Amino acid sequence: MLYYDEIFCSIQGESTDTGLPCVFIRLFECPIGCSYCDQPQKKEDRKRISVGNIVQTVLKEYKWCKNICLTGGEPLIYDEALPLVYELQSLGFKVSIETSGCVPLEEPCYRRSYKYVMDIKGPSSGVKHKNIYENLLKLQNTDEVKYVIKDREDYEFMKGVMKKYPTSAKILVSPMFDPDGKAYIGHELVDWILEDHLDVRVQIQLHKILEVK
């Protein structure tokens, strides 16, 4: 059994799938505690559900949508997370897993057909000590790594990690936004990236700009 918050359909607001219709399976509980978390969860909101019931819900309500994102919370704290992914893939869905980067990934003994979108937490998150950097070495070129940047310290930290732990995964860079929806850093971030010739993708949270779930 898993605990979850909700299952809903919207557009993907982040990653290289930005703008595509997507079914989100939001699992409950995250052991990380980032300072900028935009999905705080209340224990009273959690609900139990089986892998089978999740699959039935997706097939009944969202069969037309072929993109599924397993998110949270932290999906990988559940032993049932990957069996759920395999079941959804067997039905023809394209699945991505959003993970904090603070839970060990499985060993890359074969080429995965699902995608990880993995965070690396910077200094402003307050939890960078929880990063498992070895996860970066387990990623494929179909995976993605996301950094949230508030200031120069976060940016320099990102550069250091990229140099020490080179990965074939795509690198996504997001400016951090304050509670009023204003970016802490804007053109400066772009200037730094261009000056340093970094092969990264700058992204923003499209769903927040469009004011959709």
What are these regions (language model features)?
Residues 2-7, 11-14, 31, 35, ...:
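Residue-level signal for well-ordered alpha-helical segments
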Residues 77-213:
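Conserved AdoMet/S-adenosylmethionine-binding subsite of the radical SAM
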Residues 26, 71-72, 205:
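A secondary-structure boundary/capping signal
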Residues 11-14, 18, 34, 44, ...:
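A broad, structure-centric signal for solvent-exposed, well-ordered loop/edge residues
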Residues 1-24, 28, 32-41, 194-201, ...:
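Flexible, acidic/Gly-rich N-terminal and inter-domain linker regions that tether
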Residues 11-18, 42, 56-58, 83, ...:
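Short, flexible coil/linker segments at or flanking structured domains
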Residues 2, 6-9, 21-22, 33-114:
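Conserved Radical SAM active-site core
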